[in-house]
């Protein structure tokens, strides 16, 4: 199997921006829990000498540079102030980032649990954390109208719909991430954010 790499490109695959990295797996693919993948085997294997230090340096470099899967343009002074206002309205409540996904993506078909749509993910987060500040970030391919997964009433379901935001800025302002199978969940784990898979 071949899939976009975790650090894909500077732009969207749906806009035909070529990938800078690919995952090639001769056994399965990382998002399919029904089959073992080469990545799973590598993770289960002992690290080579110096492997832990190398991984720590790579993690620090990724976080320090702010690179993400798509590396979209950074925004967000206005959005940072909107989050601050929401925090003032709901003191002590966490900001939960909900990354939207392309709903016909193979990762959802093969890797998601009961929650399989962006709308259901927002509703699940609200049900389990009624007082939290829910920030929904549509997937950039969906936002561009290139793939399915739109949530027309997202502004009613979430406290803020964060369009045009890059993953790095979104993670910096969030306390938690709730996802189905989004790579942004992996980026959140790298950043040691509380991450929930649904």
Predicted regions and their residues:
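Catalytic-core helical/loop segments in enzymes performing group transfer/polymerization on anionic/lipid-linked
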Residues: 1-198
């Amino acid at each position: 199997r071949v899939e976009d790499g975790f650090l894909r490109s500077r732009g969207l695959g749906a806009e035909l921006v070529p990938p800078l990295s690919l995952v090639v797996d001769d056994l399965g693919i990382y998002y399919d829990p029904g089959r073992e993948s080469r990545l799973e085997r590598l993770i289960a294997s002992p690290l080579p000498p110096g492997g832990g230090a190398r991984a720590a340096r790579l993690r620090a470099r990724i976080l320090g540079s702010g690179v993400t899967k798509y590396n979209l343009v950074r925004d967000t002074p206005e959005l940072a102030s909107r989050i601050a206002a929401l925090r003032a309205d709901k003191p002590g409540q966490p900001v939960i980032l909900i990354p939207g996904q392309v709903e016909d993506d193979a990762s959802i078909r093969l890797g998601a649990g009961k929650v399989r749509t962006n709308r259901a993910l927002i509703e699940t987060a609200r049900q389990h954390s009624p007082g939290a500040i829910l920030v929904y970030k549509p997937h950039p391919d969906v936002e561009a109208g290139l793939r399915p997964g739109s949530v027309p009433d997202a502004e009613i379901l979430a406290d803020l719909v964060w369009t045009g935001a890059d993953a790095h800025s979104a993670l910096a302002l969030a306390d938690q991430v709730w996802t189905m199978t989004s790579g942004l969940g992996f980026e959140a784990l790298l950043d040691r954010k509380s991450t929930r898979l649904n």
